[in-house]
Amino acid sequence: MRLLFPFFFIIFMFQSFSFSQEWIIKNKWKISCGLVNKEALVINGKPKKTYSKNEFKVDGAIFKLNKGDVGKCKSDKKPTGGYKYSGRQEITHKLLPGKNIFEAEILTAGAPQYRSHFFQIHDGRSKGKPPSMVSVNKDWMIRNQHSIDCFKPNCKQLSYDAYLKPGERKNFKAEVEYKNKEKKISAKYYLDNELIIQHLNVPLDTKKTDGPYGPNRPYIKIGMYRIGDTGTTTFSYNKIVLKNKR
């Protein structure tokens, strides 16, 4: 029996290690800041009519903003980028240490805007750009933005021929590695399997941050955060998958 114990122990350790290397689906989202109105957010085909801080599962989400809709975050009422206010409807998910993959089919519709962020890695900072952001401009071209702590070649746009034009379904993927001990994130973004943006080894702000998951806890944001609205716009995210591997 004593001879068998080391054998079973080795098998147990191998299985535990193998399990730790497997991708695990994560699906605990919640509303960011609040609801603009009863039509601004649709989750899994059902409108979110009341604001709650509770978490929920998401397979598909539709974000809709009309001209003049102001977001519910405190900063949204303040002028920014030459515009009087920001429009916003977003949901968030905690970013876990290790490797993360977010995937979704994105479909836009409606009027253009000067700029609209549709994916962010945020660290809860109250001022300045967060570590990693992906947006569309008024011509629907995808552009990268990031904090001032990252420079080329670590942070750069690799393709200037990537668009989210209304009526065109696109497969978007984000590969994000969160190094908890180093307090850094690395992100690579793909559109229809083409690498279009990279933000590598971007430091997180560790001074005074206060996000929805507590101080110094980074998170993912998807949806619409825009300035320079010209009309009603929707961003639809279908087949949403978020998975993590430690």
Annotated model-derived regions:
Residues 6-15:
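Bacterial N-terminal signal peptides
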Residues 58-143:
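Secretory/extracellular carbohydrate-interaction modules
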Residues 146-173:
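Short, aromatic/His-centered strand-loop micro-motif at the edge of beta-sheets
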